[in-house]
């Protein structure tokens, strides 16, 4: 039957005049962590005029939310240092390309603590899905 369909389509003038459409490209998934706090995701969000940072463990999906006085790299680093002191230094931290995370201060922090800082696409926020899901949950709880 497949052969019949292929023959029909190859002889069809309407079909041959249309460009070939290939399916969507396969998703490239981040590697799964093997232990807690191996990989964490971080994101900022606002709720009722107040800024927050969410930190989520990629292994367990456990997250914590901290209120920020400002959205500066210094303030975000200050909050993250508390998390790293409590849970340990991750191998990898995933964030978006927002100002605090793209700053020299944040890169210095990553180098000093020895973790890899990976940024997600600024256009495609879903690529940092763990953090985005934690933000959604946190907003509903707050």
Regions flagged by a language model, labelled:
Residues 1-141:
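Retroviral integrase
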């Amino acid at each position: 039957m497949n052969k019949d369909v292929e023959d029909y389509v190859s002889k069809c003038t309407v079909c041959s005049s249309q460009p070939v459409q290939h399916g969507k490209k396969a998703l490239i998934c981040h590697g799964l962590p093997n232990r807690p706090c191996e990989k964490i995701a971080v994101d900022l969000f606002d709720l009722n005029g107040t800024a927050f940072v969410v930190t989520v463990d990629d292994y367990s999906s456990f997250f914590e939310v901290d209120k920020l006085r400002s959205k500066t790299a210094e303030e975000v680093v200050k909050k993250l240092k508390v998390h790293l002191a409590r849970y340990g230094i991750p191998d990898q931290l995933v964030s978006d390309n927002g100002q605090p995370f793209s700053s020299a201060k944040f890169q210095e922090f990553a180098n000093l603590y020895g973790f890899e800082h990976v940024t997600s696409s600024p256009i495609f926020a879903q690529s940092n899905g763990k953090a985005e899901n934690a933000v959604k949950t946190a907003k509903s709880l707050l």
